Amino acid sequence: MIDVPVALLGYGTVGSAVDRLLAENTDDIERATGHRLRVVRALVRDLSKERPEPPADGVLTTDFASIRDDPSIALVAEVMGGIEPTGDYVLELLRAGKPVVSANKQLIAREGAELFHTASEAGVQLRFEASVCAAIPVIKILREALVATTVHRVLGIVNGTTNYILTKMEEGAEYEDALADAQRLGYAE
């Protein structure tokens, strides 16, 4: 078993859900991958903010450098959203040799070229499948499995939150109720 200390950039709806899901599925993840992922630090703007799912003691920090400069942190999941200061944080992490996973559509769309170039230069990975189609491995299939095929276009709603809300509405739920349910489950902010 390989221990993988993980840091989160953000601990709101999505960050706390990531922490909870990693904790709930630790044994399954370890069995499938041989890796034990555990959240050891989470960057937040306000330590005093009430959180519906508080993390373990000592996990929350307002000090970005404590994540960037900690050699024991093997992976960072960016779940803050937005461009600033998120983009700067991700660039610094990549330059520091830390692999980053991001669910941030806006960041990838706007800053992706620079981020991917920086990751390549640093010899680390920037993974972003969590930002596409509720983390269904669409990007992996397009990049790896269909490497000998030219894909000209992909059409559809490839956003898990939207798909969830539309499915609930198709089942008779009102938009506001479907959105509230998605937020409660950690799918939407």
Go through the PLM ranges and name each one.
Residues 80, 85-95, 103-144:
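Rossmann-fold NAD(P)-binding glycine/threonine-rich loop
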Residues 9, 13, 17, 62, ...:
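Conserved active-site and cofactor/substrate-binding residues in soluble primary-metabolism enzymes
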Residues 1-96:
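N-terminal glycine-/serine-/threonine-rich beta1-alpha1-beta2 phosphate-ribose binding loop
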Residues 19-20, 52-55, 112-115, 137-144, ...:
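Short acidic, glycine/serine/threonine-rich loops at helix termini
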Residues 99, 125, 188:
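Residue-level detector of anion-binding/catalytic polar loops
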